[in-house]
Structures are given as C-alpha cells and as structure tokens.
Amino acid sequence: KEKQKKLWPLMAAAASQDNDIRKYEEIGTHPAANHNAISAALAFHRGIGVERKVARLRFLRDRWAKRLLAESPRVKVLTPLDSPYSGAIGLVNVEGLEFDKLGGWLMSKHRIVNTPILHKEFNGLRITPNVYTTTDEIDTFADKMMYAIKNGIS
C-alpha cells in the first residue's frame, strides 16, 4: 500500500487516486459483442443439451483418433479415449514427426487449426473440434495426418 503512490498506472488517473488501488483499473471501451452474445450462446447450449453436446464432441474426436491409431503403429493418442472426463480435445503424438512444423504445415497449407504441444514429458498436436465441425472436416484432417505420416511434410 505504501508503494502505490509512486507506482504509475498504465492508464491516466486523477491525483486524488494516488493512494487508491482503483487507479490501476482500466475503464475503457469494451467490445459489446461478448456481452450481447451470451444469451444466444446459452440458448444454443441449452437447446443442444449437455449430453448430446458431449456425445457429438467425443464422436468427432474418436473419428479421427481411432482412424489414425488403426492406420499407423507410429500414432499414439495421449488423451484417454475411454475416460468419462474427456470430450473434444485430443492430443496426438506421431513418432518421428516434429509437431511445431506439422502444426504450421496443417495451418498454412490446409487451414486446419491445431495447437502444437511441446513439453519435456510429451509432445503432440492438440486437436479440438467443436459441435459445428463436420465429419468431412474431420476426415480431411485425418487424411492430411496420414499423408504427413507416410510422406512427411513439405
């Protein structure tokens, strides 16, 4: 508290706020879309229902994951596919592939959104479909992964 007076806020603050923690609050313009979309998003979520949403997300994840596992012994899915606590997210590892390069290739060449996970204990690509992801999009992802596994990326 005694250091507050000397520490400048990032945004302009009145001198009367020198000793007030609120001088660090940002009170600028905030995007209205976030606030305005909440009720529509909740209505959509409730319309689908939690059980159907989770079932759809698991179906999409399992569609690509089980295909890759069946088609290549180099594939490991690090997300437990049989866990009641998992849904859409799948972390896939392929022996011999560099995931930062693979992730960049998938995004730049094929516009497939992914997140390379580079960790001391494990590496892979995090793949996260959403309820509106089509089976054709999932199959395209699996096709491109199989291409990379068999031929490498260029």
Model segments located where?
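Conserved N-terminal glycine/acidic-rich loop preference
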Residues: 31-37, 41, 87-97, 144
